[in-house]
Amino acid sequence: MSNVQTSAEREIVDLSHLAFDCGMIGRLKTVSWTPVIAGDSFELDAVGALRLSPLRRGLAIDSKVDFFTFYIPHRHVYGDQWIQFMRDGVDASPLPSVTTTKYPDDAGYVGTIVPKSNRIPKFLHQSYLNIYNNYFRAPWMPERTEANPSNLDRDDSRYGFRCCHLKTIWSAPLPPETKLAEQMGIESNSIDIMGLQAAYAQLHTEQERTYFMQRYRDVISSFGGSTSYDADNRPLLVMHTDFWASGYDVDGTDQSSLGQFSGRVQQTFKHSVPRFFVPEHGVMMTLMLVRFPPISPLEHHYLVGRNNLTYTDLAGDPALIGNLPPREISYQDLFRDGRPGIKIKVAESIWYRTHPDYVNYKYQLLEGFPFLDDAPGTTSGDDLQKAILIDHNDYNACFQSQQLLQWNNQARYNVNVYRHIPTVRDSIMTS
């Protein structure tokens, strides 16, 4: 009888680790990742402290912080190659890696240092792309499809991809392809009533898909069904935690800084994932996103930018609001120096559903507050996508120094995995 070990009891494995990370405002950063095996049960309890770099001025507004933990099967990354890999076992061809640049921090977006070979596993890079494309990219924006990290912009590879501003009237418009009118051909002397109803129905289903069902899972949900994350190879969002990071002002006490003060932000946090059963090999990735509310001293209410107010603008008539098509406006209608070439489409009377922030213009004359100095898109031409995505450079003037970039965190990720794996002693004492 052979004494070769072919199985193992399911034991708890402690994969806890510390992470000292830093990043930029508005960029999606991987802060922890753990490879997992089919049959695992994964638990995470992350505790730590988030700090913003020293602020130049007093603390004006809190920042919004989001933590996300995703599960991504390797099969979503490698496809049929992964299935064949597992079938062939020890005779399988090695899985390919992807190339990076030679700088140590150019894989920071996936939470690792670049090794000497300047290559990292493909599952890290592609899993990050899948997460971004499914959860952090507006559906009308083109997907990110870079085959290798070396193809990325250096800021993207070091700090993560740019994400959208928090929702406002100008940062969350309707898709650019939204129709403002719909034509129906009719005969000269008659109207097909049944055809008219059919046209209404067709328009309704087209609008539903344009506005609310741009992804397959949303379409199926509209029928009362649901789809597995396998249906469209999307990462599974296991847990999301969000909070507002606040702080305090520090008064200067020495002779040179007496009477001056600056803001300090230090916020403790906890992000927990209850026990999650892993159905097949993959990776658990935890990502972090820090954003300031998008506030500009140049923003004004939509009604303020209208020279001649019409009944439709001002009355808030429910009959009109419920039946008029979307309205096309420009950034010039919302910002003093907004670009007229940046057109957005919004629901009728959206200005009665939201209200802009107000900042006295004196703030515009000072540097150091976490406000947008210019109207969004001022430096990027008439590109709506660039106007909606956060540019961390807009906040450079807020910080006294960026030695640890714009935010940093120190955290312990308490990871316990229940796993079928022989003990270290069994591995040493082979056969």
Curated annotation (Swiss-Prot):
Other comments on record:
Phi KhT, a host-range mutant of phi K, can grow on E.coli C and B, besides K12, and is more thermosensitive than the parental phage phi K.
Record Gene3D superfamilies: Microviridae F protein
Domain of life of the organism encoding this protein:
Viruses
Q: Name the Pfam families for this protein.
A: Phage_F (PF02305)
Role summary: Assembles to form an icosahedral capsid with a T=1 symmetry, about 30 nm in diameter, and consisting of 60 capsid proteins F. Upon virus binding to host cell, one of the spikes dissociates from the capsid and the virus interacts with LPS through the exposed EF loops on the F proteins. After the genome had been ejected, the channel formed by the F proteins at the unique fivefold axis remains open.
- Give the UniProt entry's GO cellular component terms: T=1 icosahedral viral capsid
Tell me which InterPro entries the record gives.
Capsid/spike_ssDNA_virus, Microviridae_protein_F, Microviridae_protein_F_sf
Q: How does it assemble?
A: Pentamerizes and interacts with H protein, G and B pentamers to form 12S pre-assembly complex. By binding with protein D, induces joining of twelve 12S complex to form the procapsid. The procapsid has an external scaffold made of 240 copies of protein D, 60 copies of the internally located B protein, and contains 60 copies of each of the viral structural proteins F and G. Upon genome packaging, interacts with protein J. The mature virion is composed of 60 copies each of the F, G, and J proteins, and 12 copies of the H protein.
Localisation per UniProt entry: Virion
Could you give a single Gene Ontology term from the biological process aspect? symbiont entry into host cell
Family per UniProt? Belongs to the microviridae F protein family.
> What protein name does the entry list?
Capsid protein F
Keywords (A to Z) from UniProt: Capsid protein, T=1 icosahedral capsid protein, Viral genome ejection through host cell envelope, Viral penetration into host cytoplasm, Virion, Virus entry into host cell
Q: Enumerate the GO terms in the molecular function aspect.
A: structural molecule activity
